[in-house]
């Protein structure tokens, strides 16, 4: 008989209200997603506050903050140049928030926060779309503020043959419009896929294929299937930590490249 208590791989993405609040017809309840975004922002604030102390001999915390700030600063300098310095705080905040939000979803709390199981807020397209809108909105504001209608020159690459002048701007404009969608969907899909895979593998360990089985069958099952699956989960979990960092980096990198287009028109 098939097991009836299978793990639902999509349950982890369910947004649940922790504190109900309604204003008229609008539901503005404080949810688990909002909680973990607040925790991510608090973790970022604590991380930065710990690095503000300029000790003569920096400790590990201060060194970690300096490494991260230098990393983002080098990214901005390489991709935008000196004109990109004013946007370093924005790119740093996006990078660190996404990094913390991604990583917090992988932290096993084991009931330390009752009713607040780990939740990856970046696994919801509404969150990633908001982050993408912030990045893309900044690009538009910077582009039109600095260049006015000359910003549309971005859609006519230098050296475009006259024979293609009717075609290239349309392709470039379409590619430009797709940028926020690709930013949002890339992060959303990457975070969702990895977590679903971990839940599916966990189901093989928690639920044997036969609900009522002999001890001998269960021993053989966990030896041949359970242990290898558990080891595979450890490897995939380690890979997920790497994916969390890579996705935060890619989001920040693309934001800096898009800002470069808006600032330098190339």
Swiss-Prot record:
The chain crosses the membrane at residues 28-48, 90-110, 125-145, 158-178, 187-207, 216-236, 239-259. NCBIfam families: ATP_synt_6_or_A (TIGR01131), PRK05815.2-4 (NF004482). Signal peptide: none annotated. F-type ATPases have 2 components, CF(1) - the catalytic core - and CF(0) - the membrane proton channel. CF(1) has five subunits: alpha(3), beta(3), gamma(1), delta(1), epsilon(1). CF(0) has three main subunits: a(1), b(2) and c(9-12). The alpha and beta chains form an alternating ring which encloses part of the gamma chain. CF(1) is attached to CF(0) by a central stalk formed by the gamma and epsilon chains, while a peripheral stalk is formed by the delta and b chains. It is found in: Cell inner membrane. Its main location: membrane. Gene3D superfamilies: ATP synthase, F0 complex, subunit A. This is ATP synthase subunit a. It is a multi-pass membrane protein. Keywords: ATP synthesis, Cell inner membrane, Cell membrane, CF(0), Hydrogen ion transport, Ion transport, Membrane, Transmembrane, Transmembrane helix, Transport. Belongs to the ATPase A chain family. Key component of the proton channel; it plays a direct role in the translocation of protons across the membrane. One of its GO terms (cellular component) is proton-transporting ATP synthase complex. GO terms for molecular function: proton-transporting ATP synthase activity, rotational mechanism. It comes from the Bacteria. PANTHER family: ATP SYNTHASE SUBUNIT A. Pfam families: ATP-synt_A.
């Amino acid at each position: 008989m098939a097991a009836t208590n299978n793990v639902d791989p999509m349950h982890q993405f369910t947004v649940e209200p922790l504190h109900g609040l309604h204003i008229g017809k609008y539901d503005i309840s404080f949810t688990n997603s909002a909680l973990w975004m607040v925790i991510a922002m608090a973790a970022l604030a604590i991380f930065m506050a710990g690095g503000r102390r300029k000790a003569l001999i920096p400790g590990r915390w201060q060194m970690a903050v300096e490494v991260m700030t230098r990393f983002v600063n080098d990214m901005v300098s390489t991709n935008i140049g000196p004109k990109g310095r004013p946007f370093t705080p924005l790119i740093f905040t996006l990078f660190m928030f996404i990094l913390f939000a991604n990583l917090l979803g992988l932290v096993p709390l084991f009931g330390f926060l009752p009713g607040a199981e780990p939740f990856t807020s970046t696994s919801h397209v509404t969150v990633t779309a908001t982050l993408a809108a912030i990045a893309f909105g900044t690009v538009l504001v910077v582009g039109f503020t600095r260049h006015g209608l000359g910003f549309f020159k971005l859609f006519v690459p230098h050296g475009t043959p006259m024979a293609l002048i009717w075609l290239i701007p349309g392709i470039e404009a379409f590619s430009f419009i797709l940028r926020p969608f690709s930013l949002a969907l890339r992060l959303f899909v990457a975070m969702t896929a990895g977590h679903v895979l971990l839940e599916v593998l966990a189901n093989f360990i928690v639920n044997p294929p036969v609900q009522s089985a002999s001890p001998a069958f269960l021993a053989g099952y966990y030896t041949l299937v359970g242990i290898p699956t558990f080891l595979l989960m450890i490897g995939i979990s380690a890979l997920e930590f790497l994916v969390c960092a890579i996705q935060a980096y890619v989001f920040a990198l693309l934001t800096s490249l898009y800002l470069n287009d808006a600032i330098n028109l190339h």
